[in-house]
Amino acid sequence: MPQAGKRSNMKFKMIHENYNVMDLDKSMAFYEKALGLHEVRRINGDGFTLVYIGNEESSFELELTKLDDHPQAYDLGECEFHLAFEVDDYDAAHKLHEEMGCICFENPAMGIYFITDPDGYWLEIIPSKK
């Protein structure tokens, strides 16, 4: 066992984030339109469905989970967590999200804004560093 404070040779790679959703089709349509994410794979289990969505820009995936026996909306607390997306055409993305009516917070001083998905999860949009 490694000693506290010593660096080990283990390498960790982030591979996915999970969001529980109420309406899988609605969520998938939102992520496709808003962020260009599409279904990578699906697992249909006993009482649940997992759909992993992603794109060619990264190997990181978002796992959308639909639990069959969870009829009420999820309590997201104060939404102090979020997933960030870097976009190559910030102005076009902002225009699309404005048209979709999903922008929930803007911080022009920092050059960023946030959108919400159908379940209330916050997603940060930041411009590519050029």
Model-predicted regions and their roles:
Residues 61-63, 124:
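Acidic-residue sensor for enzyme active/binding pockets
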Residues 59, 68-70:
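Active-site/binding-pocket entry motifs
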Residues 5-10, 13-22, 41-42, 51-56, 72-130, ...:
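Vicinal oxygen chelate
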Residues 11, 18-61, 114:
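Core segments of cupin and vicinal oxygen chelate
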Residues 2-28, 80-83, 129-130:
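N-terminal beta-strand motif that seeds the catalytic metal site of vicinal oxygen chelate
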